[in-house]
Every structure is written in structure tokens, then in C-alpha cells.
Amino acid sequence: MSEILFFSPQPLFSHMMNKNSRLHTHSNIKNTFFSEIGIGISGNSFLLLFHILKFIRGHRPRLTDLPIGLLSLIHLLMLLLMAFIATDIFISRRGWDGIICKFLVYLYGVLRGLSLCTTSMLSVLQAIILSPRSSCLAKLKHKSPHHISCAIIFLSVLYMLISSHILLSITATPNLTMNDFLYVSQSCSLLPLSYLVQSMYSTLLALREVFLISLMVLSTLYMVVLLCRHRKQAQHLQGTSLSPKASAEQRATQTILMLMTFFVLMSIFDSIVSCSRTMFLDDPTSYSIHIFVMHIYATVSPFVFMSTEKHIVNILRG
């Protein structure tokens, strides 16, 4: 399954390892990982609470508020689920049956896919918001709010279908050590797949990632061009200050650009770590580092959003 890990930010923690290998002996890695999960859960909980309070208090929502709130919810659920699974990876075997294993790994796979898709959608929305009135994208500004909810529902169903193969391939870890099993955790394992099925699934994941990341890159480049053009125009208007609306849009765009850049860098880093794992298949340390790297984006992203939200303290104070 190393090909799937290489092509997808939605790995199944598959790792060909001996049952005698105990990841909990690496206490430093374990403590670092659970610290990362704790920080990420706190940050995403705070960001989600902020958007809920913002909605309850009747503040005028922005186009990006729903995707940002959804992204924080996805990351919160994903990190909570990972914390639960990690106890079976790093600490002790929980003795889960096949149904629990299928449910946990399937739900995690869906959440990983939705994280990628929501991030891409957020980048495209910000490009639409920043586009000038003469642009063809400007016509989508008024249509976007009505289609966001439909897009979220459609993508949720789509990723549930894409990840449905997990329900067939995940099973409870057998009592006897079997070399052809891929161990997801101490209680859950991945059944060996045929070369054809593995190749088809890897290709689908690769196409999905190429498409979504290409959308991110194109929308990011488009926003960079617009920001540079806006800055040149501002330099020619001596003595004229930017309006608060333009300033707010510019800050939001810079936040999205920062987040997109960070996401792409983390995807590249994740691919590098995933490739290195193929060279050290029985190394628990490499496996643990990969798990840590996979959740850096979910941990850091809420703090990137909050760093530019000036209304957080005001809303919480009431």
C-alpha cells in the first residue's frame, strides 16, 4: 500500500511490520504526537466556537465563513478520531472487532478526503471574492452562497463512495502473525489487495489529488497576480488610502495564500516521508514520523485563520 500512501494525503496507517514491534517503546515520539493532537483539537475547537458564536450573534457572514467553519469541524473530528486510533497504535491493543475497525478507518478516510476538498474549495472561493467586476469570476460572487451547501453535500457523498473500498479491505488483526497483512494498528489490519485493484485505487487517488491541488495552485497564482496589480494601482494613487473593505479582503487573501502554500509544502513533505518509509518498512520510528507529519496541517491551520481574525476577542467578550 506504499503507492496509496505516496499518492494520497488520506493514508490508512498501513505499515508492514512485525507483531513483535512495539511503537509504544518510542515514548518521545508518542508524547510529541499526542501533544500535536492536543494542540490541534484545542485550536480547531476554538475556531469552530468562534464561527458558531458569530452566526448566533447575527454577524454578517462572509463567503468563506462556511468553508472555514466546516474545515475546523472536519479537522476537529479527524484529530479526535486519530487520538482514539493512536491509543491502539502507541499504547496497547484495544481488541476491536472487524466492525469497529471498518467504521474507524472508513470515517477517518472520508474526513481526510473532505479536508483536501474543502481546502481547495476555500482557495477557489477567495479567488472569486478578490476578482474584479470585469472578470467572468465576478458573476459567481452572488451565486456562490447558494451552491456552497450543495457542493458540501455532494462532496461528502462522493468521498463516502470513494472510500467504500475500506469497508471491504479492513479487518480485525488475526491472532497469528501473517506476513502478507498490512497493520493499520494493533487491532486493525488491511487485507492484501491484488495488483489490479491496488493500481486502480492508486490511480483514482492520484487523479483526485492532481485535480484539487491544481485548482489550489491556479487560484493561488491568480490571487497573487491580482494582489500585485492592486498594489501597483495603490502606489499610483498618492494620498489615497485603501478602504476598510479592500483592506479586509486583502488580509483574508493573504491568509488563504499562506494556508495554501503551507498545505502544498506539507503535501510534498508527506510524500517525501512516505517514500522514505518504503525503504524502511519495518522501522516503527519512520512509521511514527509519518503519522505525525500527516496531521501538521490539521493542527496548524486554525491558528493561521485566527491570526488574522480581529473580531475573535470582541465576539467572545460579548
Swiss-Prot record:
It is found in: Cell membrane. One of its GO terms (cellular component) is plasma membrane. Residues 54-65, 119-147, 228-254, 307-318 are cytoplasmic. Keywords: Cell membrane, Disulfide bond, G-protein coupled receptor, Glycoprotein, Membrane, Pheromone response, Receptor, Transducer, Transmembrane, Transmembrane helix. Disruption phenotype: Mice lacking all but one V1ra and V1rb gene (12% of the V1r repertoire) show a lack of chemosensory response to a subset of known pheromonal ligands and changes in maternal aggression as well as male reproductive behavior. InterPro entries: GPCR_Rhodpsn_7TM (IPR017452), Vmron_rcpt_1 (IPR004072). Its main location: membrane. It comes from the Eukaryota. Putative pheromone receptor implicated in the regulation of social and reproductive behavior. Belongs to the G-protein coupled receptor 1 family. This is Vomeronasal type-1 receptor A11. It comes from Mus musculus (Mouse). The gene is V1ra11.
